[in-house]
């Protein structure tokens, strides 16, 4: 569980993280300020424009590199998840590690087919003179807001799909499981993903609200109904899907 304290400066929140299994302190983190979030969004937009130009086949190759990194670091990932959530090792392995590898392989294999241009037939007396094609384009920056109960898999799964489609990602993990979310950023960097393509902001609900204030191009949310309603209302002000 996470406990927030206010620093002496009075404007910077510090998160002290305790393991629910034995209540020992497992980390201290500075929460992102509004200026930090603005900077993160700015860097994400720059990274996304470059990433959108990368051919899909190379985006898929990145996912296979990430699989290798996860396998090489599976013990560390499981330890972080277990410390933050109190999960037993079997659940950490099956829900977080196996599921992440499965998602990476699944979407990397199918994305080239799902995202390729599609020819469509038209209706009408002059349809034989017309040609129609559907082309999929990246949305831009995707904000991924995740809960505590599947902190690694629920962060990496929407990240995989977003990146394959040519988007960049900013993850806002639960304040009680920030390290698991931060692992996703670290793992993609270890797999040689471009700098700032995947970023993480640490903070409470206010940080999540401030992230949406920066108007990402899409929001992926998993969590409670109450929080979902707040996010949906906030997104509706800027028509964010």
Write out the residue ranges for each language-model feature.
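Active-site-adjacent beta-strand anchor residues
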Residues: 30, 145, 170-174, 201, ...
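Conserved small-residue-rich beta-alpha loop and adjacent elements
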Residues: 121-194, 238-240
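Alpha-helical structural signal in soluble globular domains
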Residues: 65-69, 80, 101-108, 187-191, ...
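N-terminal Rossmann-like NAD(P)+-binding subdomain of aldehyde/semialdehyde dehydrogenases
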Residues: 1-130
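Conserved NAD(P)+-binding/catalytic subdomain of aldehyde/semialdehyde dehydrogenases
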Residues: 141, 192-241
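Short alpha-helical
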Residues: 35, 72, 76, 87, ...
């Amino acid at each position: 569980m996470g406990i927030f304290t206010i620093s002496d400066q009075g404007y910077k929140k510090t998160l002290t993280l305790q393991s629910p299994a034995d209540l020992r302190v497992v980390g201290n983190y500075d929460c992102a300020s509004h200026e930090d979030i603005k900077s993160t969004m700015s860097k994400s937009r720059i990274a996304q424009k470059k990433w959108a130009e990368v051919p899909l086949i190379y985006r898929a190759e990145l996912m296979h590199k990430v699989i290798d990194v996860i396998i090489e670091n599976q013990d560390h990932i499981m330890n972080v998840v277990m410390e933050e959530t109190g999960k037993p090792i079997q659940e950490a392995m099956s829900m977080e590690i196996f599921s992440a590898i499965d998602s990476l392989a699944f979407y990397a294999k199918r994305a080239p087919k799902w995202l390729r241009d599609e020819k469509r037939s038209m209706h009408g007396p002059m349809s034989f003179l017309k040609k129609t094609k559907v082309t999929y384009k990246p949305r831009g920056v995707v904000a991924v807001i995740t809960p505590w109960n599947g902190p690694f898999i629920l962060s990496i799964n929407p990240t995989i799909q977003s990146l394959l489609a040519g988007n960049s990602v900013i993850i806002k993990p639960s304040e009680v499981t920030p390290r698991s979310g931060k692992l996703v950023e670290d793992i993609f960097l270890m797999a040689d993903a471009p700098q700032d393509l995947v970023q993480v902001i640490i903070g409470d609900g206010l940080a999540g609200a401030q992230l949406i204030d920066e108007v990402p191009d899409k929001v992926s949310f998993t969590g409670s109904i109450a929080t979902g309603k707040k996010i949906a209302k906030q997104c509706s002000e800027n028509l964010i899907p």
